[in-house]
Amino acid sequence: CVISDLSTNKAGTVTSGLDRFMEWKTKDSNYENTEFAQFDTFYEGMFQKKRLLDILKNFILFSGTSTDRFKILAGYHQYFAVRKAIERAKKATLTDGKGGVFWHTQGSGKSLSMVFYAHLLQEALDSPTIVVMTDRIDLDDQLYAQFSQCADFLRQTPLQAKSKEHLKTLLDGRSANGIIFTTMFKFERGEKTLSER
């Protein structure tokens, strides 16, 4: 959905509140004006044929519970950051294995960016197993809940390791797929490798 008076232009979904409609502030990931997006920036940035099809396929999802679901459209910053991260991950698998840092400010939708990234990574890297490791139990629970609410979009049900042994079990014999959540506290120095994958 788009709302516009040709001065202010915003996009959202049929379930978005007015406060959730967002401007698309770039044509090509270079930020031309971060205060207000121009009319042509919004339309050329979001409605290029190839990009629009990509947004419709990979950057709109349903989240929430079975009784309270809502449709979410990625913001421009999420779209370009995730696309760049996917290209970097593909390159990393062929070179040094270093994917880089994905940075967003507080409240900018990092959890959803991670969901979009995991969704695209499944295709880009031929069904990898993704281990999401955090440094806080509350963050682990928060991310696990967000990913679980997006299980249909991810085409798999995320798993949360309850212990080091449980994590080993979840990884053991797995040759593809899986999104597994854990905390770094389950590891100790000098410990043997949990999985050769």
Which positions does each model-derived feature cover?
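Conserved motor-coupling elements within RecA-like helicase/translocase cores
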Residues: 162-180
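Short beta-strand-centered segment that lines the nucleotide-binding/catalytic pocket of NTP-utilizing
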Residues: 132-134
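Conserved ATPase-coupling elements of RecA-like P-loop NTPase cores
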Residues: 143, 190-193
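ATP-dependent helicase/translocase motor core
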Residues: 1-129, 138, 142-154, 175-179, ...
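Phosphate/diphosphate-binding loops
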Residues: 1, 160-162
